[in-house]
Amino acid sequence: VASHDRSGFAFSSDSKYKTGSGAYNDDGTLKQDAVVLYVTKDTAKTVTMTVKTDTNKTTKCDGIQNIIDALQKGKETRPVDIRIIGTVTKNDLDRISSSSEGLQVKGKNAYSDMKLTIEGVGSDACIKDFGILVRNAANVEIRNLSVLNFMDDGISIDTSNCNIWVHNLDIYYGQAGSDSDQKKGDGSIDVKKSQYCTISYNHFFDSGKCGLVDATPADSGYSDYLTYHHNWFDHSDSRHPRIRNGHNIHVYNNYYDGNSKYGVGVTSGSSAFVEANVFENCKYPMMSSLQGSDAKGKGVFSNEKGGMIKAYNNIISGAAGVVYANADSSYEAANAASFDAYLAAERSEQVAGSYKTLSGSTTYSNFDTDVSVDMGVTE
């Protein structure tokens, strides 16, 4: 098994578990006592594991959702590696514990160490007609899968999670929702009220809404610490990601390719460091609510207050516009009051507190230059 690029906040030394490798060691080898379960369309209902469910009790569980639910008891200490072969559909599963998303991974309490990997084997592994919900969990890895026709979200990392690593997925359309902006499904990979997660090396094919970050309700003492790196946003529309109440989000080395609405969007007091990305024919590479490029039209962020972006070393071509606070772009003159992002000349540059959002008077957190913050990246 090759060792993947383990970087970003999921691997920060500041995080609770310091890894998101699930059933694997950080060198890419399987943990010695890991249980490996092979799942195909024919075995998803019948795959068996004897799970420790109480201090002096084990339970024989049949079916992939039943096994994962038994892990929620919090008594099983062995890592579990679920390996999916070929295409597994919702109808192939024994059942689903999330009526809105599909397969559910849930810990007993907030931030429970699951030591769980869900991965595809080979180049054609696919889950179809359902997604995966992760809640109350930590040290969970999801990788090497195609995700097709998912129910609500493709991957939903929702509430009290940390050290979650989602990588090397191919994500296609989801099932159409009831809202006008859900024709391609809802979120491809959404992260809500969760910390120290890395979303990396994923390919989003023509997605409608790639990724929401939402720490609602807003809490001035809460930080998300999320990383998005080496993703390919391939003719997807928006939310790459859309960051609401999101504190300390690192977005780097992503490829934005023909995006019809916008790249990175920040609202509600968020701070994002956007560096070394390529924006090619992305309409508005970076946007903050109610100012800059967003203020030119009707607004795309539901009139939420603005957020702050520090931009550094990005390559932009074919955009409709970019407004920097402190420097002219090739598209427009600088505007210190109504801007999309602050343009840093050096990576170590701090954004002065005099630069604030028009709505909400938010300043940039400067988390990326704080020596006490380990972003999980070696520069």
What residues fall within each predicted segment?
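Extracellular beta-rich repeat passengers
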Residues: 1, 28, 36, 245, ...
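Extracellular beta-strand/beta-solenoid scaffold signature
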Residues: 96-106, 128-132, 149-158, 178-191, ...
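Acidic Gly/Asp/Thr-rich repetitive segments characteristic of extracellular carbohydrate-active
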Residues: 7-81
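Extracellular beta-strand solenoids
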Residues: 84, 105, 120, 134, ...
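Acidic glycine-/aspartate-rich tracts in secreted/extracellular proteins
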Residues: 87-90, 123-124, 321
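Right-handed parallel beta-helix
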Residues: 114-115, 119-124, 138-149, 161-177, ...
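Extracellular/periplasmic catalytic domains that process cell-envelope and extracellular macromolecules
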Residues: 29-32, 75-76, 110-111, 192-193, ...
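Extracellular beta-strand-rich solenoid/capping regions of secreted or surface-exposed proteins
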Residues: 52-77, 92-117, 126-143, 148-162, ...
